[in-house]
Amino acid sequence: MTSVLVNDQDRALSFYTEKLGFRPALDIPLGQYRWLTVVSPADTGGVQLLLEPNIHPAAQAFQQALHADGIPATTFAVDDVHSEYERLRALGVEFTGAPAPAGTTIAAALDDTCGNLIGIHQLTAR
């Protein structure tokens, strides 16, 4: 399991499932928040992504600083970054720019609507 801080769990669940294509995994009520995870449909027994409520002031400052500096909170590997970029743009997802070479990858960053930039990248060399 890994996590990403989100400022709205309901909006995050919608974005990560309806736009990015994850599947809901766990949804356990915890007071006013939830233990809310999603998983890749390609590996439903694989790594879960916890949509963690961003309630601590230090976490909020960290998230805001990353976003302001254009740094993705996390990055997902894709087979074809250009196709994924076009697919997501057609769904209304906003990017900071078009895919561009970055070392041994081609990468792009999108706004997850929950306070984060999320990277997508395609490995071009090993």
What annotation goes with each model-predicted range?
Residues 1-4, 25-26, 34-37, 76, ...:
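Vicinal oxygen chelate
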Residues 4-47:
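Core segments of cupin and vicinal oxygen chelate
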Residues 33-35, 57-62:
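A short, acidic/glycine-rich surface segment
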Residues 40, 53, 122:
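Active-site donor-binding loop signature of nucleotide-sugar glycosyltransferases
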Residues 41-46, 55-58, 81-83:
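Short, charged/polar surface micro-motifs in flexible loops or helix N-caps
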Residues 47-49, 118:
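Short beta-strand segments
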Residues 65-66:
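Short Gly/Pro-enriched turn/cap motifs at secondary-structure boundaries
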Residues 69-73:
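Eukaryotic phosphotyrosine signaling hubs
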